[in-house]
Amino acid sequence: MNLGFGILIFVLGLVIGLVIGFFVARNSMKSYLAKNPPISEEMMKSMMMSMGQKPSQKKLNQMMAQMKQQSEQSQKK
């Protein structure tokens, strides 16, 4: 009886730790991606230049705002 209770406590602690760890990791990853987006203005600028477009600051700002809006919408879901 004592051994079974110890195993039960161990398994419950492991499951609770995994659930808490998952949510902490997810929250920290979301905040990291919000602070450091995976693509920057410089990367967009070079991408547009390689496609043969002349990147203006207005276009870059529009694209960055559009990406930010899409990421906010996906976080709400």
Swiss-Prot record:
Record-linked InterPro entries: UPF0154
Q: Quick one: where's region Disordered?
A: 50-77
Asked if the keyword Transmembrane belongs to this entry, the reply reads yes
GO CC annotation: plasma membrane
Pfam families annotated for this entry?
UPF0154
Transmembrane ranges, per UniProt, are 5-25
Report the membrane topology from the UniProt record. Answer: Single-pass membrane protein
Q: Which family does it belong to?
A: Belongs to the UPF0154 family.
Protein name per the record: UPF0154 protein LCK_00994
Species per Swiss-Prot/TrEMBL record: Leuconostoc citreum (strain KM20)
Could you read off the lineage of the organism from its UniProt record? Bacteria, Bacillati, Bacillota, Bacilli, Lactobacillales
